[in-house]
């Protein structure tokens, strides 16, 4: 896409939001409580702040304010307000390609923000536990939240991911013509690394004329030991392993497709 010469500030709002899910099987009530406590500590407000702060660095934003809170009995939230760093628009890469995977946070922006909320959940019957994190990165100007996509999925190891990206508003070029998007995109997947795409089955639902893009991701490989909390698969009988595998897979498909499915 040809670079635009703008009149004034770039008034486009670009919003990236996604839900990530981690699924676990905990055999007893004590194990379920243990999983919730573990995941609640793993994704506490301090760690989420670190992840979101690095996200700000990746997209090229200055942190203006950070608000964070851990909740009882569980859950956490972080909100960061950010401002765009001084940057030459000519240096902004607007092509479709994956963002970085740095080895390394949430804050307040003047016109942009990053926020995350966590939702640990379990049910006394069936032994299934889920952890959900809702994340939104919304920016104004030339910086793009898509740069942070690769990093966030990598940091928040996920079994299922649903992603939405939309562009709203318009900006004008020096001739007064309105532009409702300022970069090329035909799929969110184009901003993921090949290694990331190899791990997941993915489906797109896009409404190009409305600048709305949606991608769903489901982890391809199923290894039962990855989903067990304080229980080893080899300590279970064959029938128990089959029953737990079926329950986990059904849970994952229901979350992925967003509907309840009949028992097989």
Swiss-Prot record:
Disulfide bonds: none annotated. Is synthesized initially as an inactive proenzyme. Formation of the active enzyme involves a self-maturation process in which the active site pyruvoyl group is generated from an internal serine residue via an autocatalytic post-translational modification. Two non-identical subunits are generated from the proenzyme in this reaction, and the pyruvate is formed at the N-terminus of the alpha chain, which is derived from the carboxyl end of the proenzyme. GO terms for cellular component: cytosol. Pathway: Amine and polyamine biosynthesis; S-adenosylmethioninamine biosynthesis; S-adenosylmethioninamine from S-adenosyl-L-methionine: step 1/1. The active site is at residues 112, 117, 140. The keyword Lyase applies. GO terms for molecular function: adenosylmethionine decarboxylase activity. The modification Pyruvic acid (Ser) is found at residue 112. It is an enzyme of class 4 (lyase). Coiled coil: none annotated. It catalyses: S-adenosyl-L-methionine + H(+) = S-adenosyl 3-(methylsulfanyl)propylamine + CO2. HAMAP family: AdoMetDC_2. Belongs to the prokaryotic AdoMetDC family. Type 2 subfamily. Heterooctamer of four alpha and four beta chains arranged as a tetramer of alpha/beta heterodimers. PANTHER family: S-ADENOSYLMETHIONINE DECARBOXYLASE PROENZYME (PTHR33866:SF1). This is S-adenosylmethionine decarboxylase proenzyme. It comes from Shigella dysenteriae serotype 1 (strain Sd197).
């Amino acid at each position: 896409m040809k670079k635009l010469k703008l009149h004034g500030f770039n008034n486009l709002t670009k919003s990236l939001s996604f839900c990530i899910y981690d699924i676990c099987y905990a055999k007893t009530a004590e194990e379920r409580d243990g999983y919730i406590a573990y995941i609640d500590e793993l994704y506490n407000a301090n760690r989420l702040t670190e992840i979101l702060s690095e996200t700000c660095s990746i997209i090229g934003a200055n942190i203006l304010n950070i608000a964070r809170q851990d909740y009882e009995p569980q859950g956490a939230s972080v909100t960061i307000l950010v401002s765009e760093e001084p940057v030459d628009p000519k240096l902004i890469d607007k092509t479709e390609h994956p963002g970085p995977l740095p080895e390394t946070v949430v804050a307040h922006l003047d016109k942009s923000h990053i926020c995350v909320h966590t939702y640990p959940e379990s049910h006394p019957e069936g032994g299934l536990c889920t952890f959900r994190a809702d994340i939104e990165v919304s920016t104004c100007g030339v910086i793009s939240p898509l740069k942070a996509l690769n990093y966030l999925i990598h940091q928040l190891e996920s079994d299922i991911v649903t992603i939405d990206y939309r562009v709203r508003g318009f900006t004008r070029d020096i001739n007064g013509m309105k532009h409702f998007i300022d970069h090329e995109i035909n799929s969110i997947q184009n901003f993921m690394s090949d290694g990331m795409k190899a791990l997941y089955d993915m489906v797109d639902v896009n409404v190009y004329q409305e600048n709305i893009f949606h991608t769903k991701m489901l982890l391809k490989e199923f290894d039962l030991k990855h989903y067990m909390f304080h229980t080893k698969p080899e300590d279970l009988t064959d029938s128990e392993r089959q029953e737990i595998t079926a329950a986990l897979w059904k849970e994952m498909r229901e979350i992925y497709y967003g509907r309840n499915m009949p028992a097989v």
